[in-house]
């Protein structure tokens, strides 16, 4: 949204000091910039050089039925950065990710609840009610719920690992379209956004996010996912897109 560019690391690396994750294993360090050039400058200053990236996979919209008027320019940007179409790989990922939006709140919420536990009740009034409710739900997850979510997480991770043996990166939409109004920011919209973005978080993948201009002048978003920091070819894709 808002035409900004972004980069997020994998959760096992923290080059910027004095920052700690509120949801260990899911929150990551990252930064935003107003252009691809700015993101290149900041990322070079923090990370140094990057490994090269070859061709990636354009994985479509995971079967979420994104409006073709939105999906077409997202696909065009994916192809511009070097992604190719591979229907079999895209279908493998779609099938593996069907329950990602369900598993992420369970695992991420439980991890976050452990961090917030010392002050969650004492400072309840300082939280947005919806946020507090999610953290409260996180600390009440049963062992059975956590095991079931872990099975889903493993399925998503395994699908990405299989795809990364043939493709250097995976490109997916990051949004369903342009930013919606506050009134439309309901749980249904949140769940659809999670369906697009939870797979990368569950698999712990570093990513680049880029804005995609739509015909009405607004922007949607695209995410470019890499297997790990050792193969995080952020420079290659940003240079193709700038």
Locate the predicted segments by residue.
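Structural helix-boundary/capping segments
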Residues: 1-63, 205-242
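Gly/Ser-rich, acidic/histidine-flanked active-site/gating loops
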Residues: 44-109, 139-140, 213
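Glycine-rich, small-residue loops and helix-cap segments
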Residues: 145-242
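Residue-level signal for inorganic ion chemistry
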Residues: 39, 116, 171
């Amino acid at each position: 949204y808002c035409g900004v560019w972004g980069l997020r690391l994998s959760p096992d690396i923290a080059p910027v000091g004095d920052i700690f994750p509120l949801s260990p294993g899911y929150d990551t360090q990252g930064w935003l910039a107003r252009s691809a050039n700015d993101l290149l400058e900041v990322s070079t200053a923090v990370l140094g050089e990057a490994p090269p990236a070859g061709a990636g996979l354009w994985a479509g919209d995971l079967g979420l039925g994104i409006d073709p008027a939105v999906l077409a320019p997202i696909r065009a940007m994916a192809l511009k950065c070097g992604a190719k179409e591979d229907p079999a790989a895209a279908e493998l990922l779609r099938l593996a990710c069907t329950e990602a939006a369900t598993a992420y709140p369970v695992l991420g919420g439980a991890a976050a609840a452990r961090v917030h536990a010392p002050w969650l009740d004492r400072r309840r009034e300082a939280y947005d009610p919806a946020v507090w409710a999610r953290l409260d739900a996180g600390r009440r997850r049963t062992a059975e719920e956590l095991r079931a979510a872990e099975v889903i997480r493993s399925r998503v991770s395994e699908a990405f690992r299989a795809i990364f043996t043939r493709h250097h990166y995976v490109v997916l939409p990051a949004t369903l379209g342009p930013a919606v109004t506050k009134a439309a920011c309901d749980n249904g919209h949140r769940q659809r956004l999670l369906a697009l973005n939870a797979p990368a978080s569950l698999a712990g993948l570093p990513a680049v996010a880029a804005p995609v201009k739509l015909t009405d002048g607004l922007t949607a978003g695209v995410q470019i996912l890499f297997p790990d920091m050792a193969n995080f070819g952020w420079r290659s894709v940003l240079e193709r897109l700038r």
